[in-house]
C-alpha cells in the first residue's frame, strides 16, 4: 500500500506541475523562477492529495494546500527576489474546481432546456456550492500567510 501511495503522489505532483508551469508561462514569469512555479504547484497539489487520502474533504484539503503554497511562496520570494504572487498564483490554479463548476453549469443548461427537476436542481446546487467553497478556500488560504508573516503590529 505504501509504495502505491507514493507512486500515486508522485504522479499527482508531476501532473499538477504541468499546468502550473503553463500558467506561469502565460503570466510571463521570469525564466529563472519557472521551475519553482512548477515545483510549488506540484507540492501544493500533493499536499491536497495526501490530505484527501487521509480523510480530509476537498474544501479543507484545498485550504491547507493553499496556506502551504502561500508560506512557501513568501519564503521563496525573499530568496529569489521576486513578488510572492509570481509563485503562488500559477501554483494554485491546478487546484481550481473545474469539474464541479462545469457540472453545475451543465445542470443549469439542462434545467433551462428540459425544465425544472428536483434531481437536476440538487446536482446544480451541490456542485455550485462545492466549487464556490473550494475557490473560497483557495483564495483565503493563499492570502492568510501574507497577513500572518507581514504583519508588524498586534491585531488586537
Curated annotation (Swiss-Prot):
Pfam families: ThrE_2 (PF12821)
Record membrane topology: Multi-pass membrane protein
GO biological process assignments: succinate transport
Major subcellular location class: membrane
Localization per Swiss-Prot or TrEMBL: Cell inner membrane
Transmembrane segments: 7-27, 54-74, 86-106, 128-148
Keywords: Cell inner membrane, Cell membrane, Membrane, Transmembrane, Transmembrane helix, Transport
Top-rank taxon, per record: Bacteria
Signal peptide stretch: none
Family matches, as PANTHER family: SUCCINATE TRANSPORTER SUBUNIT YJJB-RELATED (PTHR34390:SF1), UPF0442 PROTEIN YJJB-RELATED (PTHR34390)
Complex and partners: The transporter is composed of YjjB and YjjP.
Family, as annotated: Belongs to the ThrE exporter (TC 2.A.79) family.
Protein purpose: Involved in succinate export with YjjP. Both proteins are required for export.
Protein name, per record: Probable succinate transporter subunit YjjB
Amino acid at each position: 500500500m505504501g509504495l502505491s501511495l507514493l507512486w500515486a503522489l508522485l504522479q499527482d505532483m508531476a501532473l499538477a506541475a504541468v499546468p502550473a508551469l503553463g500558467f506561469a508561462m502565460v503570466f510571463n514569469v521570469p525564466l529563472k523562477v519557472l521551475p519553482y512555479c512548477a515545483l510549488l504547484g506540484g507540492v501544493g497539489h500533493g499536499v491536497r492529495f495526501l490530505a484527501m487520502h487521509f480523510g480530509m474533504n476537498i474544501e479543507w484539503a484545498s485550504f491547507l494546500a493553499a496556506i502551504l503554497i502561500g508560506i512557501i511562496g513568501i519564503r521563496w520570494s525573499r530568496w529569489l527576489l521576486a513578488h510572492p504572487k509570481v509563485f503562488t498564483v500559477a501554483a494554485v490554479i491546478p487546484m481550481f474546481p473545474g469539474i464541479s463548476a462545469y457540472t453545475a453549469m451543465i445542470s443549469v443548461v439542462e434545467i433551462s432546456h428540459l425544465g425544472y427537476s428536483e434531481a437536476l436542481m440538487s446536482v446544480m446546487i451541490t456542485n455550485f456550492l462545492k466549487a464556490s467553497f473550494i475557490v473560497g478556500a483557495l483564495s483565503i488560504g493563499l492570502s492568510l500567510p501574507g497577513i500572518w508573516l507581514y504583519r508588524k503590529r498586534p491585531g488586537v
